[in-house]
Amino acid sequence: MRVLGLMSGTSADGVDAALAQFHGRPEAPHWDLLNTASVPYPSALKERLIRMAQGEPTRACDVLEMSEAVTEIQAAAAHLCDPEQSASLLGCHGQTMWHRPPVPSGESSRESGRRGASWQMLQAPLLAHLSGRPVIHDFRAADLALGGQGAPLVPMADAALMGRIDGWRGLLNLGGIANITLIPPNAGPDRQHPVLGWDCGPANTLMDLAMTRLSGGQDTFDLDGALAGRGTVCEETLERWLQEPYFLSSPPKSTGREVFGQDDLNRRLQQLAPHSAANQLATLTAFSAAVVAQDLRRLTATGQPQPVELLVAGGGCRNQTLMRQLRRRCLGVRVRPSSDLNLPTQFREALVFALLAWWHQRGHPGNAPAITGAAKATVLGLRVNPA
């Protein structure tokens, strides 16, 4: 079955599309990536989405206008990737505007026991009409309804797509947020261990916001990590950041721009104010690597497995300074781009949502309670047919 996957991440750069063929057993499918395409968001739309996602009050009419624009760009990406409409199904994540993980009962907080919720902006019926095929969307809702985090959703798909090796294998996505998947080995005492996954913390969110500010709006990201590469990391400040509650908490956990956004950047840049722009960006870049390395060290310290390799995808893998920091801090782990194994770094998540849509069609669960904390595994997504 041919399925088209669409993904627009936390960085709100635009829409990535992946056309794939799936067949065989859902848990271990045979697959081929047939085509990929990207359509960027216009800069004005990107800015409006980011401001709203960081809590800026927005008129209802403007929300409607943005959701129409986002949906139309999703449809444009679908057409560019599959102009002959060979796919019979479309899986679309939508644009995350707010993600609110659940708060366990018993926590010393006024929000103790609060259920989780998440909003992915999309007009699914319009997308089904514009693309001329059924759309599977709202993938997080069922997991959240079962008490889960609703994220990350990629680990089970990662395990199905990449398969197993002799040791633990890690897949790290460096989008706006850094999320990691750990796949158990194909033999040995850990072979029955469940797949693991969680959100480590910020990847590109803080770096991109900082670059926009430091460049006076001329640059929205640090190309190849060039400016950060000229700076020196403020290790003392970095170590303080790593002691913040989110980074000391254990999975299941998920996060987003609502936590690591403009307000968070303002606080961190105030602490780095005496330092040069290059040093500030170097420290933020190292921070994105350090949150991953700290999580892996904690696994080892508690007797959990450490991956023998870490395959990196997402826009952050094009940041050479960030990749160097990962290799430096993830000691004993081979760090390399996922493209080394023919999984395009930019389109991994689009491929994942194509697979999740296929799983929905097959009635196969897409989440994992060990990862999200949901009460049970369940089929993800809602289906909308063309009118």
Swiss-Prot record:
Q: What pathway annotation does it carry? A: Amino-sugar metabolism; 1,6-anhydro-N-acetylmuramate degradation; Cell wall biogenesis; peptidoglycan recycling
Q: Which GO terms describe its molecular function?
A: ATP binding; kinase activity; phosphotransferase activity, alcohol group as acceptor
The record lists the catalysed reaction(s) as: 1,6-anhydro-N-acetyl-beta-muramate + ATP + H2O = N-acetyl-D-muramate 6-phosphate + ADP + H(+)
Protein origin, superkingdom: Bacteria
Kindly list the positions annotated as binding ATP: G9, T10, S11, A12, D13, G14, V15, D16
Keywords recorded for this protein, A-Z? ATP-binding, Carbohydrate metabolism, Kinase, Nucleotide-binding, Transferase
Tell me the enzyme class.
transferase
Pfam families associated with the record: AnmK
Supply the EC number(s).
2.7.1.170
Q: Might you name a Gene Ontology BP term for this protein?
A: amino sugar metabolic process
Q: Which family does it belong to?
A: Belongs to the anhydro-N-acetylmuramic acid kinase family.
Q: Describe the task this protein carries out.
A: Catalyzes the specific phosphorylation of 1,6-anhydro-N-acetylmuramic acid (anhMurNAc) with the simultaneous cleavage of the 1,6-anhydro ring, generating MurNAc-6-P. Is required for the utilization of anhMurNAc either imported from the medium or derived from its own cell wall murein, and thus plays a role in cell wall recycling.
Cross-referenced PANTHER family:
ANHYDRO-N-ACETYLMURAMIC ACID KINASE
Protein name, entry field: Anhydro-N-acetylmuramic acid kinase
* Gene coding for it: anmK
